[in-house]
C-alpha cells in the first residue's frame, strides 16, 4: 500500500458510495473503523445537492473486537427504522476486510428483511474506486432489471451518471436537450436519481446510452446480453463526436422502429439543437478558423485523466482545434489498452499510464507544453510550473462542481471546451505583456519587494537580495544556487525575465545545458545571447 497522498482514484469505499449516494431509496452501511466516515464530508463539501449523503458507518472498535461483538447488526437495524430505505448495501472497508468477517451473517442477525439487504463484499485491497462503482452498478442492474414491454415512443436509458461525476448535471442536461430535439424520450437515468423501480424498467427502453468507459458499459453489456438491447458507448465530446453520437442513436432507433412499422426518424436541422433554435448549435467550426484560434495550430498540448475524457479531449484538440498533441496518459491501467486503440495515430509516442502524480508533473516540467488538460493534481503542478492548465477529468475540486450550466458533452460542451482552451492558453499572453511593460497599477503580480533590495532568483527558486546602495557590477552579482547548479548574473536574470513566462523555465534549462557544453560556470548576459543564437531563438 502507498500513502494516500494525492491519489487519482479513491478507495473501493469511495466508488460504492458514488453509486448508492446517487440513488433514491438506497442507503449504504460501511463496516469500518471510525475515521472512514470522511467520505460523507467529501459529498457535503463538493456535491451541491440539498440531500444529506446516504451513508452510515458501523464503527469497528478495538473494544468490540476484544469482546467478539459487532455493531453491524444494530447499525443495519437502526438505518432501516430511521431512513426506511428500499435497499441497504453493506460493504467492508480496507480495515475490516483484514478481519475476514462474514458480513452476510452479521447482516442477517439484524432482523431486517433480507430482500432489503445487499452485501457487496468487494476486496478493497484489489479494487479501486471506478472498478468498485462499475461492479456495484452492474450487480444492481442484474438484480433488479426485469423483462418489460418496450415504450411506445422511442426512448433511451442514460447509464453511468453518478454522484461526484465530472460536470454531471450539466452533461446530463446537454444530453436531454439533444434527445428532446430528436423526439426521443429518456426512460431512466441511472444510477443518478434512480430508484429500485427505475432499475426494474430499464429493459423498456429502445437503446442504452453509456458514454463513460469507467462506469455503465458493463451494465449496458449485461442488458444487451440478457434483453437484446443495443447500446451506444461513445462520449459526445466535441462537434465531430456529437454528430456521430446523434447519427448512431438515429440508426439504432430506426432499426427498432422498422420492426414496429414506424416511419424512419431523420436528423433535424442542426440549428434546432442550438440554445436559441436559430443559429448553429456550436461556434467551434467557425471559431477554429479565426485568426485567434489559427494561432493555436502549433501549440503543444498534453492530456491526462480518466479514459473517457482523455480520448474525447485529445481528439477534440487535434481534430477540431488543430493543436499539436505531444502526449497523453491515464491513471487507469485497466483501461489503457482501450485508450491506446482509440488514440492510435494521435500520439507521437507511448501512452503514459501511471497513478503517480509526480511522474506526470515531471513530464510536464520536461516538455513545458503550452496547454495541459488534466485533473486537479495537474492544476496544482502547473501552477508551480507556470504552465496553463484546464481541468478535464476527475479527480476535481469545488471549481468543477458548479451551479451554472457548463457541460462538456454535446454541442454546448464543445463551446465550453473551446472557451476554456482559449482562455487558459491565451491569457498567458496578457500576463507576459504585464510582466514586460508593467502592471500599470493593476497589481497583477505579488507586491514588489521593499525598495532598498534587489532580489534575484536562482534556478532552484532561491532568492539572494542585494542592497541598491551597494549594487556591485554584473560579474559580481551572482544568484545563489544549490550545489552543482549553474549561477546566473543579475543582468542575465533580467534578460531571462523578458522571456514569456510560459517558456521561461524551458529557456533557463536550455541555457544551462548550453553553458555546460561550452564550459561556462556562470551564465552571464553574453552567455545568454550566445545560447539564444545557438538554439535558434
Swiss-Prot record:
Active site location: 292 (proton donor)
Organism superkingdom: Bacteria
Cofactor descriptive note: Binds 1 [4Fe-4S] cluster per heterodimer. The cluster is bound at the heterodimer interface by residues from both subunits.
Class in the EC hierarchy, top level: oxidoreductase
Reactions mediated catalytically: chlorophyllide a + oxidized 2[4Fe-4S]-[ferredoxin] + 2 ADP + 2 phosphate = protochlorophyllide a + reduced 2[4Fe-4S]-[ferredoxin] + 2 ATP + 2 H2O
Pathway assigned to this chain's UniProt record: Porphyrin-containing compound metabolism; bacteriochlorophyll biosynthesis (light-independent)
Cofactor list: [4Fe-4S] cluster
Transmembrane feature ranges: none
Alphabetically ordered keywords of this record: 4Fe-4S, ATP-binding, Bacteriochlorophyll biosynthesis, Chlorophyll biosynthesis, Iron, Iron-sulfur, Metal-binding, Nucleotide-binding, Oxidoreductase, Photosynthesis
A biological process from GO: photosynthesis, dark reaction
Binding site for [4Fe-4S] cluster: 36
Positions of substrate binding: 428-429
Keyword Iron among UniProt keywords: yes
Protein family according to the UniProt entry: Belongs to the ChlB/BchB/BchZ family.
Description of how the protein assembles with itself and partners: Protochlorophyllide reductase is composed of three subunits; BchL, BchN and BchB. Forms a heterotetramer of two BchB and two BchN subunits.
Protein name listed in UniProt: Light-independent protochlorophyllide reductase subunit B
Gene: bchB
